[in-house]
Amino acid sequence: MAEKDNMKVNTSPVADVETGTAEDVEAIMKKYDRESNTRVWEGVPKQVIRYLLAAFSLLMLYMNLFANWDERVRRSLFVGVVIILSFLIYPMKKGSTKKNSIPIYDIILMVLGAGAYFYFVINFKTIIGHATRISQTEVIVGVIGILILAETCRRVVGIPILCVATFFICYAFYNGLGQGREFAVVLKSVVYNLFYTTGGVIGTPIGVCSTYIALFILFGAFLEATGISEFFIQLANSLAGASTGGPAKVAVISSALCGMVSGSSVGNTVTTGSVTIPLMKKTGYEGEFAGAVEAASSTGGQIMPPIMGAAAFLMAEMVGVQYGEIAMRAIFPALLYFTGIFITVHLEAKRLGLKGIPKDELPKFGPLFVRQGYLLIPLVALVAMVMMGYTMSRAAIIATALAILVSMPNKETRMNPTRFINALEAGGKNTLSVAVACGVAGIIAGVVTMTGLGQLLISAIVGVAGDRVIVALFLTMLTCIVLGMGVPTTANYIIMATTCAPILVNGMGINKIAANMFVFYFGIVADITPPVALAAYAGSAIAKSNPMKTALIASRLAIAAFIIPYIFAFNPAMLFIDTGVLGVVTIIVTSLVGLFGVAAGLEGYMFANLNVIERLLSIVGGLCLIIPGTVTDIVGIVLVGISAALQMMQKKKAAAA
């Protein structure tokens, strides 16, 4: 039995490639993914926790389908349950190994924290009846609720976002006291706004999380239970496995597809990387490059429609458009991102002279699609429903039901009671970290609104940047990346959308969707940007490579993510805004050629090895082509054309010799 437990997990088409053991994967997740550091429950207690998480998922379904409650009641109940489950699952310190143990202080904190939010639920009508004139008891309850949510955040999400929230709360007190008000008055005002109104903890972020995000996380859990990730990997193998440097291309395709379902760049890097990274190394790629390809591709899963990262749902709410519109406008930038990585891995394979996987070791596309293509039905149906104008909640619930139905033909994935509970459990657990991050981010957004800090930031940035839009964009990018080094994507987006996005829109005149997409992108790429590049470090751990070098290569592979947001900020035609068919076609063609030029220049190879001058011509020409404009397009074509011509001449000379 022990031998079976330690067996190598191998879903690769190459039989002799050793992938990581389940223990290896778990160890890496615990190191780089805070959500994986949980208490050790066994036996009956483990089953109790399991069913509580499943019940939480059912509660979310009930609240969205049947409950006709006041929004503040629903959100407070949601946060209270999240606190209970978080304390049951996450210990005070990382690496806790005690089994079936929860300290008495954790029980006290859990009861106090959840009790604060349940107190508001029970006394809701009384509290809103006297508006801002909350009692001393209600102030104490609010303080407890905020403080214990902060401790929950430290355990589940991490310290960086907690530090940011603490700074903003301190600013709220500084602002109030600076106006000459007494501390007690300021305290009551801060607690009322941040705890009892929809301008704080139970604000828009938690509202979106308890509806759209939670339901889509649940949909992802059920979709994963159908075996769709394995299908995606096999599909990628059938499409690209035999081509030049096939395993790296398989990693790009499979990670893009699987990333839509997982929603976690670190989690996706570890799960798909345990298969793709060893295969890339066996083919001939360096460990650093293999880990970087997986990390960059997995991180991009959050920008890939139709199921983007949780922040995309918040973006739709904050911009005031349907999620379907956000997903539609994100299609081209996402395709460019993955095309850039795809081109780079192809050029690296050509430079190294790498081959693909033998065709007889790969699944055939036709038979594979006939056998398992039905697994795509829930995704296709989801896209169709969103385009047809279904509400996001309704579309997610129907798509989840379809995921259950499509699991039935295969006895290995058939949704029996055990698998059904497992999917509910996974959905409930995966919701916790997003919910906690949304609650704390709501505090930050609340302080910005309550104090007028947003207007001060606009004045400050405009004062520094003047009318130079590029300076404002650059400062915003740096802020996003620095915050993203320790703050989850969802919380990062909320912070940036309430602070920096208004600067770009109101101070610089940038399109609202483009500005929000800008901060969304840079919040995501923080996962592969040194020095705190968690997805890249996770890929490095699997590849057994140098972490910093892996992170630097991942940043180079994802160069499109650092360029594209600037382009659609200046010219939203890339997002299909204010443009016609000709404009869209032009920007697609020029951007693709431009990406090829940039990738070739950075890689140092086009049709042969590039010298310094050829690399500069390729990079500058590529950037000119990506930047919208007739003059820049002409300059770009000339420069990339010269570099390509020099390469062709060099290749002919080498062939003649």
Feature-to-residue mapping (PLM):
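Transmembrane alpha-helix interface/packing and boundary motifs in multi-pass membrane proteins
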Residues: 220-224, 255-264, 296-302, 445, ...
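Membrane-interfacial loop-to-helix junctions in multi-pass transporters
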Residues: 136-140, 199-212, 238-252, 283-289, ...
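Hydrophobic transmembrane alpha-helices that form the pore/transport pathway of multi-pass ion
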Residues: 233-301, 307, 311-314, 320, ...
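Long, contiguous bundles of hydrophobic transmembrane helices that form the permeation core
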Residues: 2-47, 328-430, 534-623, 651-657
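Membrane-interface helix termini and inter-helical loops of multi-pass transporters
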Residues: 67-69, 124-132, 188, 192, ...
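Conserved, well-structured core domains of diverse proteins
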Residues: 1-129, 139-143
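Membrane-water interface regions at transmembrane-helix termini and the short interhelical loops
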Residues: 38, 63-68, 90-100, 126-127, ...
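Core transmembrane alpha-helical segments of multi-pass membrane transporters/permeases
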Residues: 151-156, 160, 164-181, 187-230, ...
